[in-house]
Amino acid sequence: MDPQDAKKIASLRRIEAQDDSAMADVIRRVMTEFGAVGQGYSIEDAEVDGMHAAYSSGRSAYFVAHASGVLLGGAGIAPLLGAAPGICELRKMYLLPEGRGQGLGKRLMLRCLAAARELGFSLCYLETLEHMQAARGLYCAFGFQDRESPLGASGHSGCNTWMTLEL
């Protein structure tokens, strides 16, 4: 798919059960692209193969971006494990290369932060890798601030960058 086509016709919606396989593929492809494979990375999370079920109840939401029947990526929010009830985590925000640079990351972020506020969260936390510069740029553009150490108990010991945003 041409990146300009993705920009023109991509739409966002909540994840559906039939998206699970395609979203798992996106996660695995992007994590592998950035060398984030193995223990300590979200690629190993059990929810990767069942994203719809993982984000369909409680105070969580997951959104996918798609165009012309192709799932380009997604992002979600959920309570941060091991943290206060008012803290959510931005989780599994990944876009395939053909979905990048078209504003889809910004649209996904806006949707996730709106959902976080609607669900009553007051702080959004995320974990990433220092070398994921485009992602870090997006997070900074939204006002996320670096932390010196992780928050909560995500189990993602492979991440080396932690950020928060007051909602």
List each language-model region with its residue ranges:
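Active-site acidic-Proline motif in GNAT/NAT acetyltransferases
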Residues: 96-98, 102, 130-131
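Acetyl-CoA-dependent GNAT
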Residues: 7-97, 109-111, 115, 150-152, ...
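Short acidic N-proximal helix/loop "leader" segments that mark the beginning
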Residues: 1-3
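C-terminal "cap" of GNAT-fold acetyltransferases
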Residues: 8, 29, 122-125, 129-167
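Residues forming the Rossmann-fold NAD(P)(H) cofactor-binding site
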Residues: 102, 106, 110
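Short coil/turn segments at alpha/beta junctions that flank glycine-rich nucleotide-binding fingerprints
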Residues: 37, 102, 118-122
